[in-house]
From Swiss-Prot:
The keyword Nucleotide-binding applies. This is Glucose-1-phosphate adenylyltransferase. GO terms for biological process: glycogen biosynthetic process. It catalyses: alpha-D-glucose 1-phosphate + ATP + H(+) = ADP-alpha-D-glucose + diphosphate.
Length: 424
C-alpha cells in the first residue's frame, strides 16, 4: 500500500466518518464455563479494570469511528449497563453514537440465528444511518487495532469485502475460518473451521485465519444478506455461508494484522477458555507485556468506578501487607497479606495471613484470613471463607470448583453456595 495512504490521517478520518461499526456481542462463550453463566462473554472483566467489549469499542473511538452499534442477545444486562455507564461520552449532536441493538424479533419470530442473521435483522436501522461502509467486529477479542488503516486498504483495493486475518499455528486453525490468498492478497478459498486446515505456502506450519473483522461496501452487504436470508438451509453465518459464496465472483481481500512499527503480527487474544483467559491476564503483569495498557496514544476507555487508591497495611514480621510483581486496582486493601504475581480488580480485600499467588481476582472479592490461593480465577463478588486453600490439591478442588485442563481453578459465587443478586 502506498505510504501516503497510510500516513494521511485526514483521508482515513474521512473514511471513518462514513463507516458504521457493528459489534457482535451476543455470544455466551460457553468454554469459559461458569464465568459466563450470568454474563455474556464480551462483559467478562479483563485486565484489572476493563471488560472485553472495551477493546473493540476503544479501537473504534481511537480510529475515528464514532457510529457504533452493539448487537446483544445472551444475558446482556451487565453488558448493557456497562455501556450505558461508561460509554456515554460521544457527542450525539455531531452524529456520534453507540447504540445498543438487542435481539427484538424485528423481521421474524426468532432470535439471532447466526452472525449474518444478527445484522440482517437490523437492516432497517442500518438503512437509517446510511453509511458508505459497514465494519463488522467480534465483541469478544482482546487487541488494539487502527481500523482506519484497514479501511484505507479496502478502498485502495476497490474491494467489495475485506477480511482481517492473522497467522495461527496449523494445529489451532481448526477453530477459525481459514483462507488462501493469491499474490495480490485476494482471497481465493475460504473454509470455516476446517478439519484439515490448508497451510500457508511460505509457512507450512501456519494457516491464514480470519479475525472475524469484516469491511463491506454497504450496498454489497445488503444484497448478500437478503440473498442469504432467502436461501433454504443456510446457517446465516458470515464464515459458513456468505464469504464462501462471494469469493469467486466479487473482490474479496485479506488484510494482514501487523504491528505498524515492526511489521510482525500484532497482539490478538481470543480468551475463550479459562486457560487462555488466565494466561492473557497473567501476561499483563510482565515487565514489558505485548499488550501495552499504558499507551497514552491508544487508551482503552471504560467505565471509571469511583474508588480510592489501593492500600497496603501492616508491616510486622509475621503480618505484612505487600504485593510483588502484581497489578492492584483502586479500592483494594491488602491487609497484612501477601500477593505475588497476581492481578487484582477493584475493591478486592485480602485479609491478614493470607497469600495469593499467580491468580486473577475479579472485583468485589473478599478473601478471609489464613487463605492460600494459587493459579486461580476468582469471580466477581466471591466471599472466600477463612482458612480456604485453592490450587494446591486439584483433586480436592474438582469436588468444589471447575479445574481447567492446565490446572487453573475457577471459583464463582455459585460454587461457594453464595447466591448473588447483582449485575456481574
Amino acid at each position: 500500500m502506498p505510504e501516503s495512504m497510510h500516513a494521511s490521517s485526514r483521508f482515513v478520518s474521512r473514511l471513518t466518518r462514513q463507516t458504521l461499526a457493528l459489534i457482535l456481542a451476543g455470544g455466551r462463550g460457553s468454554r469459559l464455563q461458569k464465568l459466563t453463566e450470568w454474563r455474556a462473554k464480551p462483559a467478562v472483566p479483563f485486565g484489572g479494570k476493563f471488560r472485553i467489549i472495551d477493546f473493540p469499542l476503544s479501537n473504534c473511538v481511537n480510529s475515528g469511528i464514532r457510529q457504533v452499534g452493539v448487537l446483544t442477545q445472551y444475558k446482556a444486562d451487565s453488558l448493557i449497563r456497562h455501556i450505558q455507564q461508561g460509554w456515554g461520552f460521544l457527542r450525539g449532536e455531531l452524529g456520534e453514537f453507540i447504540d445498543i441493538m438487542p435481539a427484538q424479533q424485528r423481521l421474524q419470530e426468532s432470535w439471532y440465528a447466526g452472525t449474518a442473521d444478527a445484522v440482517y435483522q437490523n437492516l432497517d436501522i442500518i438503512r437509517q444511518r446510511d453509511p458508505e461502509f459497514i465494519m463488522i467486529l467480534a465483541g469478544d477479542h482482546v487487541y488494539k487495532m487502527d481500523y482506519g488503516l484497514m479501511l484505507a486498504y479496502h478502498v485502495e483495493r476497490k474491494a467489495d469485502l475485506t477480511i482481517g486475518c492473522m497467522e495461527v499455528p496449523l494445529a489451532d486453525a481448526k477453530a477459525f475460518g481459514v483462507m488462501q490468498m493469491d499474490g495480490e492478497q485476494r482471497i481465493r478459498k475460504f473454509v470455516e473451521k476446517p478439519s484439515d486446515p490448508p497451510p500457508m505456502p511460505n509457512r507450512p506450519d501456519h494457516a491464514a485465519a480470519s479475525m472475524g473483522i469484516y469491511i463491506f461496501n454497504t450496498a454489497f452487504l445488503f444484497e448478500q444478506l437478503i440473498k442469504d436470508a432467502d436461501t433454504p438451509g443456510s446457517n446465516h453465518d458470515f464464515g459458513m455461508d456468505i464469504i464462501p459464496q462471494v469469493i469467486q465472483k466479487y473482490r474479496v481481500f485479506a488484510y494482514r494484522f501487523r504491528n505498524a512499527q515492526s511489521g510482525v503480527q500484532a497482539y490478538w487474544r481470543d480468551v475463550g477458555t479459562v486457560d487462555s483467559y488466565w494466561a492473557a491476564n497473567m501476561e499483563l503483569i510482565g515487565v514489558d507485556p505485548e499488550l501495552n495498557l499504558y499507551d497514552q496514544e491508544w487508551p482503552i476507555w471504560t467505565y471509571q468506578a469511583q474508588t480510592p487508591p489501593a492500600k497496603f497495611v501492616f508491616d510486622d514480621d509475621d503480618r505484612r501487607g505487600m504485593a510483588v510483581d502484581s497489578m492492584v486496582s483502586g479500592g483494594c486493601i491488602i491487609s497484612g497479606a501477601e500477593v505475588r504475581h497476581s492481578l487484582l480488580f477493584s475493591n478486592v480485600r485480602v485479609n491478614s495471613f493470607s497469600r495469593v499467588l499467580d491468580s486473577v481476582i475479579l472485583p468485589d472479592v473478599n478473601i478471609g484470613r489464613h487463605c492460600r490461593i494459587s493459579r486461580a480465577v476468582i469471580d466477581k463478588g466471591c466471599n472466600i471463607p477463612p482458612n480456604t486453600v485453592i490450587g494446591e490439591n486439584l483433586e480436592d478442588d474438582r469436588k468444589r470448583f471447575y479445574v481447567s485442563p492446565e490446572g487453573i481453578v475457577l471459583v464463582t459465587p455459585d460454587c461457594l453456595g453464595q447466591r448473588l443478586h447483582f449485575h456481574r
